[in-house]
């Protein structure tokens, strides 16, 4: 597991009717905070190398830009909603499992959600390690430059692309044997990945 001391795991509780952040929760190293004060979150983000949230790119990033002085080019954003969808495709849904709520109408606890987000990232890293190297290679090639995914590849072992280029025929055979009934395979991989 990576050293999470420079990871800011966070969640925002935002009211779209009032267009205000009700509160936020975050974990940065040994610091666990649930607050409303923008300065604390901004300070924590300035110390972080990674910002990790569940649906961070579509939901939280616009709010962070609007209400806080947090600029994403300065940190790497990991989106556990996107990672969960990719790495656990058989799950019927990818919402955080908020078992701490006694009633569906209870307000979410952003600090508890930050803890859940951290656990989910740990699960994603573990799941990645269980994938065959061929699938790791394909996912890396397709997603290495995609927001929300690209920072993930700094946390996990990725097959050495230089060595694997020599094994492209083996990757093509593996992919065909595992996915030929699921998708159209009339594409020549050899020409695409040179």
Which residues does each PLM region occupy?
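DEDD superfamily 3′-5′ metal-dependent exonuclease/proofreading module
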Residues: 1-194
